[in-house]
């Protein structure tokens, strides 16, 4: 399962990559636009009540990706991870308190993976994988803006912004 949210593109890429690798993926989010993008990758879109509210977990997953960037999201992700499973926190949590249910992690033998990827290290492998698997990463792009209009582009509420500029020189 992927818990989408403020991490927007992170969760969508996670869902798309997992489906491309053959996984069945539930994508949980409150944003209809992101739910449609997740569905276009082949994930099962599940709408939640709002950005900060989550349903009580009714299914348990071997792997859960948290891209919510909210404290209630990380808690939901952990509580949705099955015994012996792995919960990956791939989004930023800026608050001083996230309320991670440590006892739940320990009693259910859940592996919690926290940290950001370092693109410089993995980029050649990732680009090779995208090419070999014909992964449609562009599905996540919701706005393409000319370089000169970058301030306007950054002012829009969008899932994934791409700035385009003609080659220099």
Predicted regions and their residues:
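Short acidic-hydrophobic, aromatic-tinged amphipathic segments that line or gate anion-handling sites
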Residues: 44-52, 142-149
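Helix-to-beta-strand junctions that scaffold the AdoMet/dcAdoMet cofactor pocket
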Residues: 81-83
């Amino acid at each position: 399962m992927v818990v989408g949210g403020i991490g927007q593109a992170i969760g969508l890429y996670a869902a798309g990559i997992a489906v491309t690798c053959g996984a069945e993926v539930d994508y949980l989010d409150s944003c209809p636009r992101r739910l449609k993008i997740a569905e276009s990758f082949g994930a099962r879109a599940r709408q939640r009540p709002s950005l900060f509210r989550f349903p009580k977990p009714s299914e348990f997953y071997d792997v859960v990706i948290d891209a919510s960037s909210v404290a209630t999201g990380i808690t939901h992700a952990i509580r949705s991870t099955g015994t012996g499973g792995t919960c990956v926190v791939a989004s930023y949590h800026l608050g001083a308190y996230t309320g991670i249910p440590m006892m739940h992690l320990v009693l259910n033998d859940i592996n919690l993976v926290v940290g950001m990827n370092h693109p410089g290290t993995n980029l050649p492998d990732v680009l090779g994988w995208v090419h070999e698997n014909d992964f449609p990463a562009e599905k996540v792009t919701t706005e393409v803006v000319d370089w000169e209009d970058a301030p306007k582009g950054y002012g829009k509420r969008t899932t994934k912004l791409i700035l385009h500029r003609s080659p220099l020189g």
